[in-house]
Amino acid sequence: MGCRSFLTPYVDPETGKPKYYGRFNQGVVTINLVDVALSSGGNFEKFWKIFDERLALCHKALQARHQRLMGTPSDAAPILWQYGALARLKKGEKIDKLLFGGYSTISLGYAGLYECVKYMTGKSHTDAGAKPFALSVMQHMNDKCTEWKKAENMDYSLYGTPLESTTYKFAKCLQKRFGIVPGITDKNYITNSYHVHVSEHIDAFTKLKFESEFQKLSPGGAISYVEVPNMQDNLEAVISVLQFIYDNIMYAELNTKSDYCQCCGYDLSLIHISEPTRLALI
């Protein structure tokens, strides 16, 4: 399971009780929403058509991941499948039954909602005029997961992909296919999942409240972040943000700048000033 994966509810048929430990994810395939938007040329009718084509391709790739696991004997990894890390199967028993019925999840990931909406509407998804389109994109992916789940008895769910190195890979592929599109492909990254773009001026509480609406539509996993300055001497503010997270959003965390000077041992925040060889302390 990834760092932001959510386990969907599963009731053990033998005990009739919910079970969370020992479960796992079969894999993730991520759709590049920015590519879908750029491929449509800004035409909404084409967008939805291409969107469905790309989702079908993702579905095919997810099925390939699933088929790769089918037939795996428990002997392939005894600690996982026989000794209780994930299951307690018999020697030689196949893991197939764990791939169906919701015991394990399989995830449709997504990336670049901000750039997708920006290209299609000319506005950020934080804008009231563009937000409905952003939510409709999220809902459409959820609907597809529900459709696949009913047809195959596998727990497909929508997942806010961490991206990490993939953000650079996606960005470079977009630049190669579409060139530099101002505000869309002019950076060597695309925005993670539903996140507010890093360039937007927005306070922590507004950001968390806004993103909570999208996190609800990402039941396979998601996380929101807010960046704060050094807060060692302002713990009340930290607690107020944490309380807001607790009250408004499922999963979020604070990022804070942490610097360390190897000469004097200063360990708060350092910023560059006009002279490039000097640092200022804050």
Regions flagged by a language model, labelled:
Residues 1-111, 115-119, 228-230, 238-262:
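Structured mid-domain segments that build the active-site/substrate or prosthetic-cofactor binding neighborhood
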Residues 262-263, 275:
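Short, cysteine/histidine-rich loop/knuckle motifs that typically chelate Zn2+
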Residues 150-192:
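Extended amphipathic alpha-helical segments with heptad-repeat/coiled-coil character used for oligomerization
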Residues 94-100, 120-126, 144-155, 248-250:
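Secondary-structure transition/capping motifs at alpha-helix termini
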Residues 81-87, 124-128, 164-178:
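Short glycine/threonine-rich loop-to-helix capping motif typified by GTGT followed
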